[in-house]
Amino acid sequence: TEHRMKEPFFVLATQNPFEMDGTYALPEAQIDRFFFKIVVDYPSESMLETILDQTTGAEITTGKQTITPQDILRFQQRVREVPIASHVRRAIARFVRSTLPSEPANPAAVREYVRFGISPRGAQAVVLAAKARALLDGRFNVSLDDVRFAVVPALRHRLQLNYRGAAEGLNVEEMLLELFDAQARAAIP
């Protein structure tokens, strides 16, 4: 059965730590469908007080609409219109390929510690996020800095370490940035 959802449609989800009872790992194919993984720190004491005030009192707090669905659709279309220079696109393609453990020329750390590299869907997420960041910064062109900004939130959940990499405590975010930086340096015209 297929149900057509009204546009724009997107889902925000939370991920509980695997250590919690009743929590199961998602298959890689499902993980890859999440555009971003944003890590939210535990609220500060003052923020926690605000949360308690706004959620446990008699007065019901409601949000205020600041953007319409049509605004979101227009922004999504505008993001897709942002051009990306060939050297930036090449850096992304080379970076994504550098995460594949099956490639003999890739760094030893990738071949030894990575179970699953970045998929084409991950590369698409990086491009779209970098384009959005450029627009939000008032520019109609994507820089390597925009791409670097997008790498961790768009890919931290997609690069899967193997057992050995996890056991040795490798940091996925650091690995992603190191791999991207190497390709970005090589791509500068």
Where are these regions (language model features)?
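Canonical AAA+ ATPase core
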Residues: 1-82, 131-133
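Short alpha-helical scaffolding segments that buttress acidic/His motifs in well-ordered protein cores
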Residues: 51-52, 92, 150-155
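C-terminal engagement/docking regions of AAA+ P-loop ATPases
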Residues: 101-189
